[in-house]
Amino acid sequence: MLSDLNPSFDGISKISDYNFDKFELKVLGIARLLFESNEYPIAQTWKSAFLKAEQNFSSPFGASIAHIISISIDFMSNGRTSNFNYFKENNNSSLTLITDEERYFLMALKSIRNNNISKANSYAVMLCEGPQINKFLLAMEGIAIITGDIEKKAAGFNGAVDGARTRDPRRDRPVL
C-alpha cells in the first residue's frame, strides 16, 4: 500500500496516461478495496468492494464481477514473492495515480477484452512474477465473459471460468 505519492515516484504513473475505459476504472476501484482487504482483513473492505460492484454494475452482474476480481487477485497473489503496491480506494491520489502492479492488472484485463492473448500473457507474467499465470488469466477471462467482450471459448485460452473452476471440454462440466 502506498500513501500520498507523486507520479515522479518510481512505479507510479498518472491514470490519464493510459486509455482505460470507464468499466476498467470501475474494476480498479473494486480491486483496490479487495487489495486492501487482503492486506488488512480486519478492515473488511471486501464488503465495500461488493457493495461498490453492485452499485456500478446491473444486477446480478455486480456480485459476480466482484467475486471474479477477488478470485483473480487470489490467483495472482499465489506466485508473487514481492509486495503488491496499490493505492487505497479512499486515498486522494487514487483518482489520478496508478501503481505499476495495478496497471499490469488492468492491462491484462484490457488485453483479454481485446482478445490480445499474447499481451495478456506478458502482463500476467509481470503481475504474477512468474509463469504460473493460467488460473489468473482464466479468472480475468471470466470478467470479459460476464461483460460479453469475449465468448466462453476464446482463442488462446484453455477453458472458461465458472467461479474458480475450469471446464473439462470432454464432459462440458466443471472440474472440481
Whereabouts are the PLM-identified features?
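Polar/charged low-complexity regulatory segments
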Residues: 1-106, 110-159, 165, 170-176
